[in-house]
A protein has these predicted regions:
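Membrane-interface extramembranous regions
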Residues: 1-138
Length: 138
């Protein structure tokens, strides 16, 4: 049982390492202005591309640090969601961005499976059952 859990955690680290590495490379290219100006102009963004690159770097770094991986997962999801919206608004394919978003969440589940427990439906508490007049089951 413990060996399976370790393999899942290693798999999550590998997945997040690959995604974060790709984001660090792409974010660095944006921060240092290595993108051609014509490509940046085609995006039609009001923010300078360096700001987006800095956000991408921040998301990737937070995703890799164990203590901040939950925040990194949330921010990275927002980043890829924004990339999907940008491509949808330009009527461009967004399959790769969607795949990266899915991979980020799979890696998050593999690294910390208990983190998704807050998404489950909980039964009514004892006080809520008393408030609506339901019989208490002990």
């Amino acid at each position: 049982m413990k060996a399976t859990r370790n393999w899942k955690m290693v798999g999550g680290w590998v997945v997040h390492g690959l995604i974060a590495g790709m984001m660090i490379l792409a974010g660095s290219a944006k921060v240092f202005g290595l993108f051609p100006p014509e490509e940046v102009a085609k995006l039609g963004l009001s923010l300078p591309i360096q700001v987006i690159g800095a956000g991408e770097l921040g998301c990737a770094i937070l995703l890799l640090i164990p203590r901040t991986s939950s925040l990194g997962l949330l921010l990275t999801s927002g980043f890829w969601g924004g990339a999907i919206c940008l491509h949808m608004s330009k009527a461009e394919p967004f399959f790769m961005q969607s795949a990266f978003l899915l991979i980020v969440w799979v890696g998050g589940y593999l690294r910390v499976p208990g983190a998704f427990g807050s998404f489950t439906v909980r039964s009514k508490s004892k006080l809520e059952r008393e408030d609506v007049g339901e019989a208490l089951v002990v």
